Amino acid sequence: MAPRGSQRTVNKIVAENRKARFNYEIIDTYEAGIMLTGTEVKSLREGKANIAESYASDEGEEIWLINSHLPEYLQANRFNHEPRRRRKLLLNKREINRLRVAINREGMTLVPLKIYFNEKGRAKLELALAKGKKLHDKRETEKERDWNRQKSRLLKTG
């Protein structure tokens, strides 16, 4: 019989928003819990989620994850969840206030970076406070990435 701790998935990344780091300049990151139903957790454990087009929004005293897609759990019949429903994010009051100030006054955006399971087996969302990049900034990032690839190729051959 396996030890109890080995059955858990430690920091298993379920979904990652890879375009976020290209489209936004990441200022700060936060770890937030997600309020999920049972079938949503089971769907996440299967590794099925998409947060590519999702974003977070503040409404009142709460922060919500909007437009994230968690597909229905196939073994659940009539008690399934809606795949694109809004999900409440669990943050400290102090963190929520700090994020609201940054969004409203400084014109920043809340972008989800990845969904993963922590050591305790709880689903967490890595949320980034970000500023949108302009087109020339994106081109500059792409040029820098290409130059780094060329440098690594030259170092391997020479």
Curated annotation (Swiss-Prot):
SUPFAM superfamilies: Small protein B (SmpB). Its main location: cytoplasm. GO terms for cellular component: cytosol. It is found in: Cytoplasm. PROSITE patterns: SSRP. InterPro entries: SmpB, SsrA-bd_prot, SsrA-bd_prot_CS. Transmembrane segments: none annotated. One of its GO terms (molecular function) is RNA binding. Required for rescue of stalled ribosomes mediated by trans-translation. Binds to transfer-messenger RNA (tmRNA), required for stable association of tmRNA with ribosomes. tmRNA and SmpB together mimic tRNA shape, replacing the anticodon stem-loop with SmpB. tmRNA is encoded by the ssrA gene; the 2 termini fold to resemble tRNA(Ala) and it encodes a 'tag peptide', a short internal open reading frame. During trans-translation Ala-aminoacylated tmRNA acts like a tRNA, entering the A-site of stalled ribosomes, displacing the stalled mRNA. NCBIfam families: PRK05422.1, smpB. Belongs to the SmpB family. This is SsrA-binding protein. It comes from Allorhizobium ampelinum (strain ATCC BAA-846 / DSM 112012 / S4) (Agrobacterium vitis (strain S4)).
